[in-house]
Amino acid sequence: MDKSKQLFRKSKRSFRRRLPPIGSGDRIDYRNMSLISRFISEQGKILSRRVNRLTLKQQRLITIAIKQARILSSLPFLNNEKQFERTESIPRPTGPRSRNK
């Protein structure tokens, strides 16, 4: 190959293949809380398929399992944990207000 063609040729980069988030032995079921909890956000929302890196069928099964677990009360619909705790409040003056003009 002459040099002009070698300049435009792209080098093949090696990439590390990611492991699938659900193994072949994992059973997608509403009772498998350790598996289901990996696909729920901190707020309690179901994460998207793009974020989870799941196939369409796996995402559908995960969604159904999460909804069944919510209905059977083994998983909350919302995560109501208080993320922001109030710090000490500054005492307000209780006297009559004065307007500054």
From Swiss-Prot:
GO terms for cellular component: chloroplast; mitochondrial small ribosomal subunit. Keywords: Chloroplast, Plastid, Ribonucleoprotein, Ribosomal protein, RNA-binding, rRNA-binding. InterPro entries: Ribosomal_bS18, Ribosomal_bS18_CS, Ribosomal_bS18_sf. Residues 1-23 are annotated as: Disordered. One of its GO terms (biological process) is translation. Its main location: plastid. PROSITE patterns: RIBOSOMAL_S18. Disulfide bonds: none annotated. Residues 1-19 have a biased composition (Basic residues). It is found in: Plastid, Chloroplast. It comes from the Eukaryota. GO terms for molecular function: small ribosomal subunit rRNA binding; structural constituent of ribosome. Part of the 30S ribosomal subunit. Belongs to the bacterial ribosomal protein bS18 family. PANTHER family: 30S RIBOSOMAL PROTEIN S18, SMALL RIBOSOMAL SUBUNIT PROTEIN BS18M. This is Small ribosomal subunit protein bS18c. It comes from Acorus calamus (Sweet flag).
